[in-house]
Amino acid sequence: MHGERPSLEDITLILEEIPEIVDLHCDEQFDNSEEDTNYQLTEPAVQAYGVVTTCCKCHSTVRLVVECGAADIRHLEQLFLNTLTIVCPRCV
């Protein structure tokens, strides 16, 4: 469009065929027992977690890496919050 206001002369309509409507729902069905078997065989995700804490004797920084699942790292966190402490190699 050129000018300050649009006019009918500036508008061009391009009429094409209307696209065909396609049903996207699939009627394919799976055997549920096969899906359940595959799900049960997968192991829980294991990930590496970095743990930074202090030595209970000299209060120096101690860093370690553990590999475990999400539930296990939460359990480890609870142990640190309760009575579990780490001793650095120098204080052992």
Curated annotation (Swiss-Prot):
Q: Where are the zinc fingers (unnamed)?
A: 55-91
A Gene Ontology cellular-component term? host cell cytoplasm
Q: Does the keyword section mention Metal-binding? A: yes
* Location in the cell: Host cytoplasm; Host nucleus
Query: Where along the sequence does the record place the motif called LXCXE motif?
Result: 24-28
Which GO molecular function annotations are given, in alphabetical order? DNA binding; DNA-binding transcription factor activity; protein domain specific binding; zinc ion binding
PTM comment: the record says: Highly phosphorylated.
Q: Pfam family of this protein, just one?
A: E7
Chief location of this protein within or outside the cell: host cell
User: Where on this chain is Nuclear export signal (motif)?
Assistant: 73-81
List the cysteine pairs that form cystine.
none
Q: Which domain of life is it from?
A: Viruses
| InterPro entries to which the protein is assigned, alphabetical | Papilloma_E7
Keyword annotations:
Activator, DNA-binding, Early protein, G1/S host cell cycle checkpoint dysregulation by virus, Host cytoplasm, Host nucleus, Host-virus interaction, Inhibition of host innate immune response by virus, Inhibition of host interferon signaling pathway by virus, Interferon antiviral system evasion, Metal-binding, Modulation of host cell cycle by virus, Oncogene, Transcription, Transcription regulation, Viral immunoevasion, Zinc, Zinc-finger
Q: From the UniProt entry, list the residue stretches annotated as the region E7 terminal domain.
A: 1-43
Q: Which residues form a coiled coil?
A: none
Alphabetical GO biological process terms: DNA-templated transcription; symbiont-mediated perturbation of host cell cycle G1/S transition checkpoint; symbiont-mediated suppression of host innate immune response; symbiont-mediated suppression of host type I interferon-mediated signaling pathway
- Per its UniProt record, what HAMAP family does this chain match? PPV_E7 (MF_04004)
Which family does the similarity line name? Belongs to the papillomaviridae E7 protein family.
Domain text from the record? The E7 terminal domain is an intrinsically disordered domain, whose flexibility and conformational transitions confer target adaptability to the oncoprotein. It allows adaptation to a variety of protein targets and exposes the PEST degradation sequence that regulates its turnover in the cell.
Q: What is the name of the protein in this document?
A: Protein E7
- Identify the coding gene: E7
